[in-house]
Amino acid sequence: MKPLKLKKLILEVHETSIFIILIFKTTDKNTIITHVRHVRHELLYKIFANITRLKTVLNFTGIDPFSHKLSPGILDLIKIIIASFTLAPLRLYCIFNLLCLTWFVAKIGLLCTNNKKTNEKPFSGWRRVLQIFIRKVFRAVFFCMGFHSIKISGDKSSKEKAPILVCAPHATIVDAIAVFASGSVPVAKQGVAKMYFIGPVFSFIQSLFVTREAASSRQQTVDQIKSRACDLEAETSSSHKWPQVFIFPEGTCTNSRALIKFKSGAFQPGIPVQPVLIKRDLNTLDTLTWTWNQSYGELVCLWLTCCQFSNSIEIEFMKVYEPNLEEREDPRLFASNVRALMAARLGIPTVERSVSEFTNDGGSAWSINNQKTSSKVQEYPYVIDFVGNLTQT
């Protein structure tokens, strides 16, 4: 074993021992957090799952939602090596051809249209048929990636009951499965529109694009969400109505181990929303997650996913959430309560931080009361919300 690895292992054992001793010796949370350094929280949580005090402290210190580390075993590595020369190239070849097909169809659909006016009213006639065709082709794309069957639980509500679908946790580009499975229109960042293959497709299905850095763009997107949700500019005929708006309120990809602060855009109209959950088996080799702090990018993520013989994902449609008067007047409260309900259903905590705070801080550690701490300390304060603490009138 290399000296550096041995030193790191000794440090981990030492700090973990201090952490466990402090849990049983002191009642001061600040003292405990001060001594937390590189402690493997998840492992401790599993070992001492029945100890209430340890649960409380671990939930308080939390888990970094923006980091992901792939830890393949020997068998996983063997499968990846074999699939890299057999299964993955075949799958990627099929995916490439299907994406070319969707790009070609989208380009045909966008002929004789003004890019600035594509979102003024929903497409109808032959363009609507092409939109449906593209959704079917994308289902074939996901099949080629190994998603042979997608488990869908719950019932998707009608637009009259819930004009907006809010989905979490958002961990990977594969989450687009939920968009196409629901037949809705997504809200995406402006960068998606510039992607060569994907951009024209998302433009043709009339996605809403938002520039996060520009306040005017965000407000314009909110106005468009309100317009589409209420069909203010559409005809009364069902064939000329906008489909439901699909939003990932977290606004970025996380590792699915906690729900970060929801952006309020989806909740500003003050109308009912239907929460949608994406469930993945985090106990298996997680090749799907693509977040901020990991050692490989989206292309490697796609390659590793195609190396898996079969991938599983579950989409659950929860009951429609109707805001009360207080929530209609306060979008942040509305968003917080919906997030609490979704987190409770998923069995994961919520963290009172957003990706903008993480990136503005350069990805450094967060601490209680936003105070800077040593770079060695990884502290992510959580707030646990359960259904029992959620009141709705």
Language model regions located:
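Cytosol/nucleoplasm-facing, intrinsically disordered, low-complexity tails
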Residues: 1-5, 10, 36, 44, ...
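A cross-family acyltransferase "interaction/gating" segment
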Residues: 196-204, 240-244, 251-333, 349-376
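Intrinsically disordered, low-complexity basic segments at termini and long loops, enriched
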Residues: 1-41
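Eukaryotic intrinsically disordered and solvent-exposed regulatory patches
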Residues: 80, 91, 150-154, 159, ...
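Short amphipathic C-terminal alpha-helix that caps PH/PH-like domains
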Residues: 225, 334-345
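Beta-strand cores of modular interaction/reader domains in eukaryotic scaffold and signaling proteins
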Residues: 94, 151, 165-167, 178-180, ...
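N-terminal membrane-anchoring alpha-helices
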Residues: 2, 28, 40-146, 372-374, ...
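Catalytic core of membrane glycerolipid acyltransferases/transacylases, capturing the structured
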Residues: 103-149, 158-220
